[in-house]
A protein has these predicted regions:
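Membrane-embedded alpha-helical bundles that constitute the cytochrome b-like, heme-associated redox core
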Residues: 1-182
Length: 182
């Protein structure tokens, strides 16, 4: 058996896992910051997908109004923290992402025909990897979110005109929100 990283490959096999590590790592850092900062997630008729659906909040997009008064004042409130666990759980347990972060973050396996760090692979039958099997349940939750995201994309197509009426229009934000649903 080959030791970790040993291979007869001549190509730069390590580039893709390193770039994936940087990309996924940057996304995790950014999304964590975006979820906890709890501000600047709306602009006019646009609502950030990280905050959709906004259940409670101080914007006009909030479905149930302002944050509940029973929340402790010392607890930082962000509308994203109420909902991000569902699409995040779907993405984290998704087969594609599992393959990407297994290779890039755990180097298991690092690439095809490259030595692995361990030789006693147990698959996803033991804790904690058996938790990956909740993917099928997160799918149903993620599908519910598509309706809210589509609704937000539709709302993003209507802009307040100078006459005070709503007018149909398409901006860059509208295109991004619509592409997110598709």
């Amino acid at each position: 058996r080959r030791g970790f990283g040993q291979t007869m490959r001549k190509d730069n096999w390590w580039v893709a896992p390193v770039l994936t590590f940087i990309g996924l790592g940057a996304f995790v850092v950014y999304s964590t910051w975006a979820a906890f900062q709890g501000e600047h997630y709306t602009f006019g008729n646009y609502l950030s997908p990280f905050y959709s659906p906004e259940l409670f909040g101080n914007s006009s997009h909030a479905l149930f109004g302002p944050p509940p008064s029973w929340l402790p004042s010392w607890l930082p409130f962000s509308p994203a923290l109420l909902i991000l666990w569902a699409p995040g759980g779907f993405r984290f347990t998704c087969y594609y992402y599992r393959g990407a972060y297994y290779k890039s973050m755990w180097a298991d396996p690092p690439a095809c025909a490259v030595g692995e760090p361990r030789h006693n692979y147990r698959g996803e039958r033991k804790f904690p990897l058996i938790l990956q099997n909740v993917h099928r349940y997160f799918l149903y939750l993620a599908l519910l979110f598509l309706f809210f995201l589509a609704y937000d994309a539709w709302n993003a197509m209507w802009f307040a005109g100078a006459d005070g009426k709503q007018h149909f229009g398409v901006g860059v934000g509208t295109i991004v929100l619509t592409a997110n649903v598709l």
